Curated annotation (Swiss-Prot):
One of its GO terms (biological process) is translation. PANTHER family: 30S RIBOSOMAL PROTEIN S12 FAMILY MEMBER. The keyword Ribonucleoprotein applies. Belongs to the universal ribosomal protein uS12 family. It comes from the Eukaryota. CDD domains: Ribosomal_S12. Protein S12 is involved in the translation initiation step. Component of the mitochondrial ribosome small subunit. It comes from Arabidopsis thaliana (Mouse-ear cress). This is Small ribosomal subunit protein uS12m. Its main location: mitochondrion. The gene is RPS12. It is found in: Mitochondrion.
Amino acid sequence: MPTFNQLIRHGREEKRRTDRTRALDKCPQKTGVCLRVSTRTPKKPNSALRKIAKVRLSNRHDIFAYIPGEGHNLQEHSTVLIRGGRVKDLPGVKFHCIRGVKDLMGIPGRRRGRSKYGAEKPKSI
């Protein structure tokens, strides 16, 4: 416990906040190229095969990004747009791919939550 005089002389050191999305360089999104597309199993108690892509961003950072939605057309060398946002049950996956931008297609035939998955507006009858 510092004395009052020590606090006047030195002050308190502020805690540094860690940046969870350091690879984005303070940008809202970044583009990147897929190095590998694979699946990964989540932590307990969940069970699935979550689709992820290893992406090299335009600033040369290599990251893992989650591919949301059902089905995708990503391959090696596809370009994608990346945003922040972790996947709670996949350790080390702190980014999401944005659907409907660059080489990652939106989900055809999706009617709800279309903006999150880059889906076209359905034709009204």
